[in-house]
Amino acid sequence: MAKKKATKKTAKTEAIEVIFSFDTTGSMYPCLTQVRRNVGNMVKKLFKQIPNIRIGIIAHGDYCDEGDPYVITMLDLTDDEKEITNFVKNVDSTFGGDAPECYELVLYEARGFSWSSGKSKVLVMIGDDIPHTASYAGNTKNLDWFRWLHGFHSVYFS
């Protein structure tokens, strides 16, 4: 019986774009410290393992942080590893001071990033609370967080 020659299959890598969002309020300081410490290695691995990946970053406090230092600050999708790492390492911490947090604003703002057509859209949210309701006084756009989930390939909450 003749043996079949083994052929090497080429793995098809899915085109993907990812936004990492992290809560920068006081209760998240220990996590933020770890994120800053490990971001360089994480970004390097992602770019090595996923060809043509683009990564965006959203750092957010809460509505009570308006102007001191910020409610939300963002880095649009990019393939510049150094820019991503520097953004995360240098983003200011916020205060928060109440619960919930403005995760609904993150979902809303993420939709405005420069997503490529034909690529999977992934949002990874790192936080320790729940989103505000649409009726919350600080939520001046009356954002319903559930409505803004649609359109992403995957949304992960941690």
Map each language-model feature to its residues:
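Divalent cation-coordinating acidic motifs and surrounding scaffolds
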Residues: 1-158
